Amino acid sequence: RRSFIKGAAAAGAASIFCHSPDRAHGYQSPNDRPVFATIGLRNQGWAITSKSFKFADFAALADVDSNVLGANVEKTEKTQKKKPDSYKDYRKVLDRKDIDAVMIATPDHWHTKIAVEAMLAGKDVYCEKPLTLTIAEGKLIERIVKQTGRVFQVGTMQRSESGKRFLQAI
């Protein structure tokens, strides 16, 4: 069951590049794979990152905990055979022009701030739930998505998967 949930999260993250035909078909060559970064690497952050290596290259990882960051940099390097850059300050990730998208799995109260800054920096975003803590934050996200035209995906597994709905029905 855990594997399924992690796989569903990775599929959700992958779907941020299937929003429009040019993106869905734009990454055909191994030389033209999307470049990702993950911000927040504990538990769910690493789970979605580790399931995403098959469709993206990770150029950077960010986490405020040096121990968590170091361990995940090592695991990423072993998996993709290239060491990602590491940052304690997520803003350094957003400053990079080579990163196409970020996956955000920080504590909940950081989600909106980082997601907005990422879109304004020209990044597509996959963000774990809950996306926002207030209605005003939700409206801000909506406005920034429309303003920037960025692709935005929220991880909603366990809330929308068919197995969950089936269990609720019985």
Question: Can you describe what each PLM-predicted range is?
Answer:
Residues 161-170:
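Oxidoreductase and adenylate-handling cofactor-binding alpha/beta cores
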Residues 74-80, 144:
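Short, conserved SAM-binding/catalytic segment
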Residues 83-104:
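A structured beta-alpha segment of the ubiquitous adenosine-cofactor-binding alpha/beta core
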Residues 58-75:
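NAD(P)-binding Rossmann-fold cofactor-contacting core
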Residues 16-50, 54:
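C-terminal segment of N-terminal export signals and the immediately downstream linker at the start
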Residues 1-11:
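N-terminal secretory signal peptides and thylakoid transit peptides that target proteins
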Residues 107-108, 112-160:
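Beta-strand-loop-alpha-helix segment that lines the small-molecule cofactor/substrate pocket
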